[in-house]
């Protein structure tokens, strides 16, 4: 257990270097997550015989990836970053992967910002190709949660988004302070548990779009719980009634998903 508690003291966030370019474990985990999401999407298209051809699926993932990156980065800057005004006046720095001449990748991403970017990209894609967005959204609800697990593992390997101070034996030392390995809590609850819920819901699905709403509700609830063990974002802290910004956004997300679900399922709103 002692090795685990001091794992950050014996671990390098850089996996290897290629011609002087440092490749971080976080980047590797991000690529694994993206590839897994695509493979799972292809699997579920075949398994449930969805009306999505492979060409459209590949194109859709490209659109969504662009939307997610833009939304995640802009969302972080507008919601969490303490230097928002700097980026507004220096927009070319938003996606600058270098700090003092060293390649460090793009740091600072917001999940809730990624959701907005993802939804916008989906709507634009489906409008261009005249397809039903709910089919793609339900597919994402099935294919993303397990891939999300690797994203949180990437956060752990990158030594970021760590937990609150604790005395549990499985805690890890960060700057000499024992903290919850909250990234793994999130990987389990927001990834594995959410996937199980959405997958089971698929077999009782009563309308298109139900799975993405189930995903939104399940994820936001899981995230709300995990935030109790995760250190509040630097520079923001607790925002309202002892809640973090992540909890407030998750609460809004949960209520929105619940209201849309009720309107569609019980009021027979056409989608």
Curated annotation (Swiss-Prot):
It is found in: Cell inner membrane. The keyword Magnesium does not apply. A 1,2-diacyl-sn-glycero-3-phospho-(1'-sn-glycerol) binds at residue 152. The chain crosses the membrane at residues 25-45, 60-80, 103-123, 134-154, 181-201, 209-229, 235-255. One of its GO terms (cellular component) is plasma membrane. It is an enzyme of class 2 (transferase). The keyword Magnesium does not apply. Pfam families: LGT (PF01790). Coiled coil: none annotated. It comes from the Bacteria. PROSITE patterns: LGT. Keywords: Cell inner membrane, Cell membrane, Membrane, Transferase, Transmembrane, Transmembrane helix. Its EC number is 2.5.1.145. Pathway: Protein modification; lipoprotein biosynthesis (diacylglyceryl transfer). GO terms for molecular function: phosphatidylglycerol-prolipoprotein diacylglyceryl transferase activity. One of its GO terms (biological process) is lipoprotein biosynthetic process. It is a multi-pass membrane protein. PANTHER family: PHOSPHATIDYLGLYCEROL--PROLIPOPROTEIN DIACYLGLYCERYL TRANSFERASE, PROLIPOPROTEIN DIACYLGLYCERYL TRANSFERASE. Catalyzes the transfer of the diacylglyceryl group from phosphatidylglycerol to the sulfhydryl group of the N-terminal cysteine of a prolipoprotein, the first step in the formation of mature lipoproteins. Belongs to the Lgt family. This is Phosphatidylglycerol--prolipoprotein diacylglyceryl transferase.
């Amino acid at each position: 257990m002692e090795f685990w508690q001091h794992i950050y003291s014996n671990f390098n966030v850089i996996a290897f270097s290629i011609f002087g370019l440092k490749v971080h474990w976080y980047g590797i985990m991000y690529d694994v997550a993206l590839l897994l999401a695509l493979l799972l999407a292809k699997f579920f298209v075949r398994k449930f015989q969805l009306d999505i051809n492979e060409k459209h699926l590949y194109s859709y993932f490209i659109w969504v990836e662009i939307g997610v990156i833009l939304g995640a980065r802009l969302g972080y800057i507008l919601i969490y970053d303490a230097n928002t005004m700097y980026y507004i006046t220096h927009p070319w720095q938003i996606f600058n992967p270098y700090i003092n001449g060293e390649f460090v990748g793009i740091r600072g991403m917001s999940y809730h910002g990624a959701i907005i970017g993802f939804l916008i990209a989906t709507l634009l894609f489906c409008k261009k190709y005249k397809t039903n967005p709910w089919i793609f959204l339900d597919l994402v609800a099935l294919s993303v949660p397990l891939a999300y697990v690797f994203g949180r593992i990437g956060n752990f390997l990158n030594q970021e988004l760590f937990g609150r101070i604790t005395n549990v034996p499985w805690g890890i030392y960060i700057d000499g302070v024992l903290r919850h390995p909250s990234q793994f809590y999130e990987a389990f609850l927001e990834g594995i548990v959410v996937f199980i819920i959405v997958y089971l819901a698929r077999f009782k699905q009563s309308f298109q779009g139900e799975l993405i709403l189930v995903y939104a509700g399940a994820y936001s609830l899981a995230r709300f719980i995990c935030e109790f063990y995760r250190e509040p974002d630097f520079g923001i802290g607790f925002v309202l009634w002892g809640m973090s910004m992540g909890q407030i956004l998750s609460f809004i997300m949960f209520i929105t998903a619940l209201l849309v679900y009720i309107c569609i399922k019980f009021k027979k709103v056409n989608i």
